[in-house]
Amino acid sequence: MMKTAVMFILVVVISLTYSSEEQEVARTYCGRHLANILAYVCFGVEKRGGAQYAPYWQETYLRSRKGPGVVDECCFRPCKLEVLKSFFFFFCD
């Protein structure tokens, strides 16, 4: 009986631990915030200034990618970090 109670409590605790893990929330990223999050994804740092990499990113994007852009995917509608990471090879060198 005692072993059953301990096992039950253990299962409940483990279940609560896994269910309480933070789920990534989709967010919108526009303007400077989009530039900052792209810099973070690319370089692992937060940018202090404006969009200093934006001209390079825009030029690379126009040459390399067909279809919806990062603004379409993450500014006009919410996106998750995984979507931003899918643009990694187009914005990060």
UniProtKB/Swiss-Prot annotation:
Which InterPro entries does this UniProt record tie to the protein?
Bombyxin, Bombyxin_B, Insulin-like, Insulin-like_sf, Insulin_family
**In which compartments does the protein localize?**
Secreted
Q: Which UniProt keywords apply?
A: Cleavage on pair of basic residues, Disulfide bond, Hormone, Secreted, Signal
GO cellular component term of the entry, any = extracellular space
Question: What would be an example GO MF term here?
Answer: growth factor activity
Q: Oxidoreductase as a keyword?
A: no
- Signal peptide, first to last residue: 1-22
Q: Which Pfam families match?
A: Insulin
One GO biological process term is: positive regulation of cell population proliferation
Q: SUPFAM superfamilies from the entry?
A: Insulin-like (SSF56994)
Primary subcellular site in the record, as a coarse category: secreted
Superkingdom of source: Eukaryota
S-S bonds: 30-75, 42-92, 74-79
Query: What is the documented function of this protein?
Result: Brain peptide responsible for activation of prothoracic glands to produce ecdysone in insects.
Q: How does it assemble?
A: Heterodimer of a B chain and an A chain linked by two disulfide bonds.
Q: Which family does it belong to?
A: Belongs to the insulin family.
The miscellaneous comment for this protein is: Silk worm has two kinds of PTTH: 4K-PTTH and 22K-PTTH; there are many forms of 4K-PTTH.
Protein name as it appears in the record: Bombyxin B-11
Q: Which organism is it from?
A: Bombyx mori
